[in-house]
Structure formats: C-alpha cells, structure tokens
Amino acid sequence: MTITDVAKAAGVSRQTVSNTLNSPEVVREETRKHVLEVIERLGYRANQAARQMRTGRSRLIAIGIEPDGDGISGSWADRFLHSLSETAAQEGYRILLYTAADDHAEIATYEDLLGAYKPDAFVLTGTHHDDLRAAWLLERGLPFVAFGRPWSDLPDARHPWVDVDGAAGTEAATRHLLGAGHRRIGFIGWPPGSGVGDDRREGWARTLTGHDLGGLQRAVEDGIAAGESAARDLLAADPGVTALVCASDSLALGALQAREPGRPVAVIGFDDTPAARAVGLTSVHQPLGEAAAACVDLLARALESPDAEPPSAHVLLPPSLTIRKSA
C-alpha cells in the first residue's frame, strides 16, 4: 500500500494525500476528512520516521493516565481517552500514553518523551492548585491543553483549558431533589483544597442557600468504603436527612450501602459511570466526548496556526443529570 494507492482510491492527487498527512492546514476541511476516511478504510500507514524528518513534527499528542483507584472513579478517564484517540485520529494525530506518580515524576517523563518521541503537544489531566506541570510547559513554550481548570490561575488562565462545570452538575442534582420534596439534603465530598471537589461542593451549597436551607456535609478521600463510612456518620448526626449529593459515583455507591431498612434516602452521584448504570444510581453525566473534541480542536489550531488566536481558549461545558431509581 502506497500513497499513490490512497490517492487513486480517494480520487485526489498524490500531493493532496501528502498534504493531508504532513501539512493538513493547506487542505480544505472537506477534502482532508475524505482523504483521512479513505486512509482509515484502506489501512494505510505512512512511514512515521520519514514524515517526522520532513516536517519536524511527530503528529503525537502525549497524555498521562491516572491510577484506577477503586476501579470506578477512574472509568471516566477510559471514556475520555477513547474519545480523545478517535478525535485525534480524525485530525491526523496519534495519542501517546504515559504514567507518572506526581508532578515531579510527570515533568521528568516530559523530558524523556521529548528526547525519545518528540510529541507535538501534551494534554494535562488531574489539574490542581499550584500545578507544577503547567508552569514547566509554559516556561518552555510547549503546546498543551488542560482537561481541567488551572485552579491557581483563575480567572486569568495563561493557557488553554477545557472542563466540565462541576458546580452546575451538583446544582442540577440538588434542584432535582428539592423538586422531589427533599429539604434536608447532605453532601459527601472530598477534603477542601481540591479544585474539582470544591467546585462540586459549591453547586450544592449555593443551591441550598438560594432556598434558605442549610445542610450537613462530610469530606473524605474518594472510594466506596469511605463513602459508606461518611454517609453513616452524616445520617446518624442528622436523622432528618432524606437525600445525599455525592462528589463521585464511588462515594455515592458507598452511600447506597449505608442506607438502613425503613429509612429511605435518595442518593445522587457524579460521573455517570457504568457502575451507576448497573445499580440504577442517578448521576451527573459529563460530556466527555465533547470535552475530548474540544481539547483536540484547541491543540490542532495551535499546532497548525501557531500565530493565530483560537476563538476561545477556555471551554466550560455543561453537564446533565441522568435520572435513575436512586433519586
């Protein structure tokens, strides 16, 4: 299989196929997508080393994968990576995966990857306050996008990011419970200082305050066992609580186990994992496919037109509430 075979099958010139692979910015979007579809159908694989020598680019996007934890909380990452890989392939890029235990280890991995594979860009996940990774990449002018807000730099972030509005998600969950008649609604989240966790707690607290209501909360590390323990403690502290909003499906699954016979308690999770679907857990759904597409779009724009300013370098996506039998 050669580039000439692809050109014949696509009904375009050999140069158009070459441009699609090596200089996609000069090819009309409709033509580029058509050629990429033919390439995928034929199973054509260009000589990556030769292409990199010609263009100085690897067409690789590197992203770290996080530990799976209890096997539930990390399942959102699987869906995000799948969507990221699909979308990147449509733009002519491939995904390079790596693992790292913390910021320092991840920065060391960046140096190794840049020396061995020369990725064109990076996608950061698990963003947090005082993120050393973002600062390191910014100092060196390396293209990257974060899936997650740069919590220490808001609202004037210095780099592109894509995120899901966690506060909007827990607000929707709390409003749903209020609409069902609940007035004593507790919250089980993570210890303060987590940007994501604080954001999700804020949506619950803000909604209750707007209805002149208050509520108990518990903060624990993520996990089913921790969620069960926190729920038991909260329900014992306030026998009037009839509903719980949780910062993750792992915590919510634990809360379901903490319910006692004769005391119905509605429970809502966050992430809409396969486990939530299996047990009928109402959960906040994150548009991970849309988030992955936005990440690739921001990176592709930066790589194909380095001097152009993207229409919006910061994308905050709204979640939705998937209602099941638990609430």
Q: What residues fall within each predicted segment?
A:
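Amphipathic helical "hinge" segments at domain boundaries
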Residues: 44-109, 205
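Short acidic/polar active-site loop segments enriched in Thr and Asp
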Residues: 13, 59, 120, 183-185, ...
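Flexible loop/turn connectors
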Residues: 237-327
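N-terminal helix-turn-helix DNA-binding module of bacterial transcription factors
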Residues: 1-59
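Hinge/beta->alpha junction and helix N-cap segments in small-molecule ligand-binding domains
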Residues: 67-79, 98-106, 162-172, 187-232, ...
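Flexible loop/hinge segments that line or gate small-molecule binding clefts
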Residues: 125-171, 250, 271-282
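Short, well-structured alpha-helical segments in soluble
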Residues: 106-118, 227-239
